[in-house]
Regions:
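A short, basic N-terminal segment
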Residues: 1-68, 212-213, 217, 221
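Short glycine-rich substrate-engagement loop in P-loop NTPases that contacts/grips substrate
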Residues: 56-64, 83-89, 99-146, 158, ...
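Surface-exposed alpha-helical segments enriched in charged/polar residues
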Residues: 64, 68-71, 100, 173
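Conserved catalytic network of the ASCE P-loop NTPase/AAA+ motor domain
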Residues: 73-74, 108-111, 141-144, 173-179, ...
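Walker A/P-loop nucleotide-binding motif
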Residues: 74-96
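Loop/turn-to-beta-strand initiation segments
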Residues: 114-115, 145-148, 178-184
């Protein structure tokens, strides 16, 4: 019988089992597919230090430590703010890698119990306004209640309406109140700038509740 091997399996280098019969693969794949990650973002990510980003050696070390202990990070209700003025130097990749790792450790036995989500903040704000494809109440509930959410490119725009602000504030505030872990990525490195874009109430809930790690290396795009 021909073995059903998936070339995109996260364990392909260390496993020879039939993916079609693998409970681990099935449960991890379900988490990935329902998290909001694109297929390209579901693939394993390799991050490394080279001449372009050698300035980030300590930041990579700190991020690697969080990633290696991501279950403790979530269980301790911690938040993370990964920021950089540079584009393409690993902010989003690190956040996704942490979400992958959390799924790896916690997906087993959690089939159809969503553990984490990835959200492009700009897309979310656009969906708040899209009456043809509105954000469902279930989606909002999941954003407020899953163990770990990645808000990618938070504060990427200053053109945020009061309605958008209220929706975003409510989700983030409820996560903080419920002691749910959140990872933010942003090109805003200073609190004062974040406050100008999002206002003090939301900026405080994002920045002051998070461990802040700044990347300064050049982008690879």
């Amino acid at each position: 019988v021909e073995s059903l091997r998936n070339s995109d399996c996260w364990y392909i280098k260390s496993c020879n089992e039939d993916c079609g019969r693998c409970v681990t693969y099935t449960q991890l794949k379900w988490q990935m597919d329902n998290s909001g990650l694109y297929l390209s973002q579901q693939k394993p990510i390799e991050l490394f230090i080279d001449e372009q980003n050698s300035v980030d050696r300590q930041a990579y070390k700190a991020l690697g430590k969080i990633r290696n202990h991501i279950t403790e990070f979530v269980d301790e209700h911690r938040n993370l703010y990964i920021c950089s003025r540079e584009v393409g130097n690993g902010k989003t990749s690190w956040a996704i890698k942490m979400l992958h790792t959390y799924f790896h450790y916690r997906a087993k036995g959690n089939y159809e119990n969503l553990l984490g989500m990835f959200v492009n903040t700009t897309d979310l704000l656009l969906r708040f306004k899209d009456f043809n494809n509105p954000v469902s109440q279930k989606y909002k509930d999941d954003l407020e209640n899953v163990d770990l959410v990645v808000f990618d490119d938070i504060a990427v725009t200053s053109n945020i309406s009061q309605y958008d602000y209220t929706q975003l504030f409510n989700i983030i505030n409820k996560r903080n109140m419920a002691q749910k872990s959140t990872i933010y990525t942003s090109n805003i490195t200073e609190y004062s700038e974040l406050e100008k874009l999002l206002g003090p109430r939301l900026a405080t809930r994002i920045y002051d509740s998070s461990e802040v790690i700044e990347l300064k290396g050049a982008g690879r795009r």
